[in-house]
């Protein structure tokens, strides 16, 4: 009888040992809980412009229910150097929770940046460019898609608007200078070339001045330009912080009456300068929408949503068919709205842009749009 009892006990222990643990136990749940997969957005530098884009990323995360899919989107701000982007891309290759990467490329021809983008792609990670692209002529296989502004068109719009401002002041010839962070950046170069093309042959571009994303240097560049070219007729700001830098130095020198100022993007300070009469017009992108569409695209690539990809890129495979553009706005002073004699009208610009992709807004109307989305700049 004793031997029988021992045998039964041993069998009981053996059976217990062979049972599978409860998969719903707290310990098991804790060990297997999934860390959210991340979509990473790498900026080219640190500027409030990217805060607006990040607001769009988070709005996109909510709109497309990333959390329900075990995903999140995170913005990482680069230190305004190519090496910073290279190093971060290399780090992301080694991280298991990266599902997709969007990058605003700081140098369009930087081979190392493109090579690191390709390494991510080879690992199965979706990679796109947003806001700043690579040079597609040199690196046709560097990325599948771009989201952002058609910067050549944007430059032509600014050049056309600037020429109208100059002509309204009786200035039909003279020199202009363009200011940006980097002259070899894809979006900056396309804008400057487009502006030079559209402003016309009567106006000569005498310099392009880069500040390497240094806001203090941006102001110093304007001061230097005014010393070197005292008769300059127009100053053109290409990146968001260039606009307030130009406006501040022109006000400091007391020469607003003889210098026209037209710029890109609507930094909060630039909006105030326009309200005070220190900027003539601004071409404004839609970084908020860039953020929303970035999430939409990365999710579609992650989940193989072919219908979304076709909707976003109906002409994929054709020249320019890999680009999703997010529209442009021309912001004008309130005094020009409904004024038949205003220097600029939408009709003046229609030849430079496709139908339906340009809005002309007064500053007050634009401010209302910003307020609607809780933004201070765009």
State the predicted function of each range.
Residues 14-17:
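C-terminal motif of bacterial Sec signal peptides marking the signal peptidase cleavage site
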Residues 19, 25-35, 175, 179-183, ...:
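Hinge/cleft segment of the Venus flytrap/periplasmic-binding protein
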Residues 49-65, 154-158, 186-203, 221, ...:
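Short, solvent-exposed amphipathic alpha-helices that sit
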Residues 63-79, 173-178, 195-215:
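Short beta-strand elements in bilobed, periplasmic/extracellular small-molecule ligand-binding domains
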Residues 85, 146-174, 218-219, 266-270, ...:
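Hydrophobic alpha-helical segments within soluble ligand-binding/sensing domains
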Residues 99-122, 195, 207, 211-273, ...:
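Hydrophobic alpha-helical
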């Amino acid at each position: 009888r004793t031997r029988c009892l021992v045998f039964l006990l041993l069998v009981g222990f053996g059976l217990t040992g062979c049972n599978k643990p409860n998969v719903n136990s707290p310990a098991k749940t804790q060990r297997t809980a999934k860390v959210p997969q991340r979509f990473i957005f790498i900026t080219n530098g640190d500027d409030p412009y990217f805060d607006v884009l990040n607001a769009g990323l988070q709005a996109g995360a909510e709109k497309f229910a990333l959390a329900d899919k075990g995903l999140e989107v995170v913005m990482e701000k680069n230190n305004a150097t190519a090496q910073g982007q290279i190093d971060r891309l290399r780090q992301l290759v080694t991280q298991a929770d990266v599902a997709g990467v969007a990058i605003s490329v700081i140098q369009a021809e930087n081979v190392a940046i493109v090579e690191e983008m390709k390494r991510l792609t080879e690992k199965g990670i979706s990679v796109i460019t947003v806001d700043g692209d690579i040079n597609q002529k040199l690196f046709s296989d560097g990325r599948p898609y771009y989201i952002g502004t058609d910067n050549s068109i944007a430059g032509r719009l600014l050049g056309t608007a600037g020429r109208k401002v100059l002509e309204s002041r009786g200035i039909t010839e003279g020199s202009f200078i363009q200011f940006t962070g980097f002259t070899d950046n894809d979006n900056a170069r396309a804008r400057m070339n487009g502006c030079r093309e559209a402003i016309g042959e009567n106006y000569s571009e005498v310099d392009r001045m880069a500040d390497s994303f240094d806001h203090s240097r941006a102001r110093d560049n304007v001061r230097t330009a005014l010393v070197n070219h005292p008769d300059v007729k127009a100053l053109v700001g290409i990146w968001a912080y260039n606009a307030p830098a130009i406006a501040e130095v022109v006000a400091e020198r007391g020469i607003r009456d003889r210098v026209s100022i037209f710029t890109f993007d609507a930094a909060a300070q630039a909006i105030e300068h326009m309200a005070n009469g220190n900027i003539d017009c601004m071409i404004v992108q839609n970084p908020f929408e860039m953020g929303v569409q970035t999430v939409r695209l990365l999710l579609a690539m992650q989940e193989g949503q072919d219908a979304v990809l076709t909707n976003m890129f109906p002409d994929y495979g054709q020249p320019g068919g890999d680009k999703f553009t997010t529209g442009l706005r021309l912001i004008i002073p309130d005094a020009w709205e409904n004024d038949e004699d205003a220097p600029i009208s939408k009709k003046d610009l229609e030849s430079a842009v496709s139908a339906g992709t340009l809005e002309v807004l007064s500053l007050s109307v634009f401010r209302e749009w910003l307020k609607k989305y809780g933004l201070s700049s765009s």
